Amino acid sequence: MSSVARTVRTTPDRVWSVLADGWLYPLWVVGAARIRDVDDTWPEVGARIHHSVGIWPALINDDTEVLEQQPGQLIRLRASAWPLGQAHVEISLTANGSHTDVVIEEHATSGPGAVLPDVVVAPGLNWRNVETLRRLAFIAEKRPIRQPADQG
């Protein structure tokens, strides 16, 4: 089990806007190489991101599914990269003044990570998830806010 926290210098809504755009996942999720498709209903429960993980040309095609979500507060995912395994990943957002405390928790549910002791698995997951939250923060803090185009 890995649990990593970071304070992001923007609002929960801005962080959620990154989480809610499935096409952005390879920009901030360490190990995600590309997105092949995103269900139109993302990030609703049951929606999937169809991704590839690894380094080209050694890529694994699989998906990540939303198990639970509360817009602006929480998303719980089932991330797959078979035969490497599956994991449950929870990302929670808590307002902290004008900032957001973000916590990512990851727990392997199948594959090698599920049978190895946490003392073996956690250091690598923690290292990866520190970088994942760093990348998420860069996007949420610095991505321009787009205004709707005039319809008139």
Task: Please provide the spans of the model-predicted regions.
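Hydrophobic ligand-binding cavity/cleft-lining segments
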Residues: 1-44, 141, 152
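Intrinsic-disorder/low-complexity, polar/charged segments enriched in Ser/Thr/Lys/Arg/Asp/Glu/Gln
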Residues: 1-7, 13, 48, 61, ...
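Hydrophobic/aromatic beta-strand elements that line small-molecule binding cavities or substrate pockets
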Residues: 6, 53, 62-68, 79, ...
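A short, structured loop/turn motif at beta-sheet edges
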Residues: 12-13, 40-43, 67-72, 92-101
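Short glycine/serine/proline-enriched coil/turn segments at secondary-structure junctions
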Residues: 43, 56-58, 83-85
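Short beta-strand segments that buttress and anchor functional surface loops
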Residues: 48-54, 75-82
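Short, cysteine-centered beta-strand-loop-beta hairpins and adjacent loop/turn segments enriched
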Residues: 54-60, 110-113
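Beta-strand/loop substructures that line and gate deep hydrophobic ligand-binding cavities in soluble
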Residues: 78-131, 138, 147-149
